[in-house]
Amino acid sequence: MGFPEAKWAVDQVVSKVGVQPNNMRKFEAVALNETTIGLTFLEPEDSYYSAGGALAAVTKGVLIRMSTDGYPQDINDGTLVVDNTVLGKYENEYFQVNGLTKGTKYYFTAFPYSNIGVYNESLNAANKADAIPNALEKVSVTINIDDTKRFTSTTITLKNVNTSEQTTMNITEAKTVMFEAKATNTYVVTATAVTGYKNGALSTEQFTAVAGGSRAFTFNFEMGFLYGIKFDNGGDGIPSSYEYLEDCAGFTAASVSTMNSWLGKRILDKFKPCLIKPGATAPEYYLNKDNYNQRAEGSTAPILTGADGDVMIEAERMWFKLVKNGDSTATLYISEVELDGYKSFIGNQDVAYRGAYEASVSGGVMRSISGVAPAVNSTRATFRGYAKARGGEYSQNDYYLLRLWQCMYLLLYGTRDSQTAIGRGRSASGNQSAINTGTMNAKPFCWGDTGGSNGMKFLGVENFYGNVWEFVDGLTIVDYVCKITEDPSKYDDVGTSYEITAGTVPSGANGSYIKEMQATNDAPFLPSVVGGSETTYFCDALWTNSGTRVPIFGGAWGNAGGVGAFFWLLRSDASDASAGVGSRLCRKKVSS
């Protein structure tokens, strides 16, 4: 204990000088410019011997002293700054101490005193403050980059909101840079976006610079994945002829449920099974990817039969591009971030939803629930109406979502022979009917076998192909010309209002095997040339006819080899309905 503290304690014990006031309720020092420090303070309240007891000390004022050698130790130490008796005057406004030396640290001690002249000289921390005069605040900005291979540069800007003045620095690597901000001015720090990285332009909240102060900001640049696969498209005819490019160069493709190099990659996290209700802005909850009988979190069993909503796969937005090469190959790229020339799989939505099961219908309303027979024997238009009856955000088996699943299949498995890569699906010629929905609830997220009876599952979607054919909406073939819309409000069976025309399919195909795809962003896997076989090129067949035709995809329970990821039936009339043709519920995101 120092002498002043000891003296104070003794004085209290022997009651030589009466009761001293309590400590300051507020005492702060801040640099205002290169030669001025501002003090804000609030004197102690009057003190009492006990709660509700007699008055012990009445606060009259505060004496503040200053030194450059350390905190003044008593009421005579250092230089007098102010003797204030207007209590509360400087609680929210500065008492300015002028004429100071830039860069020198100044120490202040407050000595509150009573109406009988008793000072609090306890040197309590509440009675001390210090600051260094400086007109500027130092601002550091740190750039972190998780992977630099596509990083070009970002421009960091410190902008003065008051004057519009700004200072910029061009950054090409991970580093920390320093700026200076004028005291009392308002600023914002920004960083421009970098192509290929997940974050867009970055910005801080506005802040007011404090003289002599410092603050630090960090901007993290996380590179989005970019995967590529170059595949045969009418060249050597070998289904397994492909080459992985970009971030998946050197990968080993998936095989049935074994994801090999794709295991744990972020792209698989873009697909999540969930329960979602009409009008909801988010799912009720998510499911265990490899066992729909369990929630992703928590021990409560999920309800897959309708009460908790429809069982659907939530697909996050990604971008893709198809390039048709000059050597009878094509290249598919899938990017986590938007790049020039790339197309969003799901438009401007953050997420979209595709039924985990084939559609069922109850009371004229389409559902995606477990434990029921797939709905069949309706026209495409009728199924469209059933989907709309579920809610304005619903549609049936959107072409743009089917396109996403086709692209993902090719990227993950490489080979165009899907029945070999992931399973035959329910397709054996001896099958007499479709299997019910939910028979693969406990199977892995990607699953299949070679028996032809048990179905298959890809990215959570049961019977991606096989079991029942599925109508596809948003695509209509008019005299072999592909008419496409990505706006479900335009869905019809004639395609006259569809905004995209995407090439032609081969005329007169009658179970002809596909040799070459259009390989464009709008029509990546709509056929352009036939002449393959069940074991060459795309290993899947095509039927076409003239006139206006509604598309059917995938194959059915007894088609043997006639099912697959690229199997198209493009010869059906709008009036066609069949016991082997169903649909699938799809859904847009509902904004909050």
Per-segment meaning from a language model:
Residues 115-121, 179-207:
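Surface-exposed interfaces of beta-sheet-rich extracellular modules
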Residues 13-58, 102, 118-136:
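Pro/Thr/Ser/Gly-rich low-complexity, intrinsically disordered linker/stalk tracts
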